[in-house]
Amino acid sequence: MGLTGKETILIHSSMKAIGEVEDGADTVLDAWMEYFADGLLLLPTHTWANVNAECPVYDPRSTPSCVGLLTNLFRRRNGVVRSLHPTHSLAGFGKGAAEYLAGEDENNTPCTPGGAYDRLKDCGGKILLVGVGHERNTYIHSVEEVLNVPNRLAAEPMELVTILPDGTEKKVYMRKHYNAMQPHISEDFVKLNQAFLDCGAVEEVVFGDAECLLCDAKKVFRVVRHVLAPDPECLVTKTEIPAERWRNFE
């Protein structure tokens, strides 16, 4: 894959796609944590499926992740730090994990500009999609927030509660992803597949049995900005994005 192990890397994954591994998911996590020990390994530990207006409490020590087996095992490992974002937390291991994830309890949207997702583009960050596609690439939500794409967030916030490390409760007002035309906005991110490949922002690689996409965060940001510039809502409103849209990308 051309990775040195010193990168800041966010991995979205499907254990099922990786295939049979001796000792299963723990072996996969061991490999990632060992390889990226001199970098910063990030996994999503989202809770949007089980933290909401009806069930508003997020405790980073105990609230389960809703995005897969590997993420739930990872968040409980020694040395792993979990952010305080009540719906779109990340867990990190390695160099500067606590510092990188600090302040996420101040966010009021899933991927607030200046937050942990956005800063991937500023630190040479990578995103590795293991056995999943861009429909699971939360970073694109972040890009849309930075670009202020309309009709991506609910008008009214939810009132949530984050349990801080000292046990105190912090009230957080969080707007969730929402679009009246498309209840699952990220499903349309796959319309950018060819643009990313053609523009050199994404490389097709393999991990185990899983087909993977290795993304450069800064390049992904630039491609999305370029493609959306003439029609910011096109990912939802158009059935496909014509290649002419990125043919002159530099």
For each predicted feature, which ranges?
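Short, solvent-exposed amphipathic alpha-helical segments in soluble enzyme
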Residues: 26-28, 143-148
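Short, flexible loop segments at boundaries between secondary-structure elements
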Residues: 37-38, 150-184
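A broadly tuned preference for mixed-charge, low-complexity surface segments
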Residues: 55-69, 94-97, 173-198
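N-terminal active-site beta-alpha-beta segment that forms phosphate/nucleotide-binding
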Residues: 4-54
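Internal, conserved structured core segments that host functional sites
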Residues: 52-141
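Glycine-rich phosphate/diphosphate-binding loops that line cofactor/substrate pockets in enzymes
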Residues: 1-8, 120-123
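Acidic/aromatic/glycine-rich contiguous surface patches that form carbohydrate-binding/processing clefts
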Residues: 175-250
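Histidine-centered active-site/metal-ligand motif
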Residues: 12, 141-142
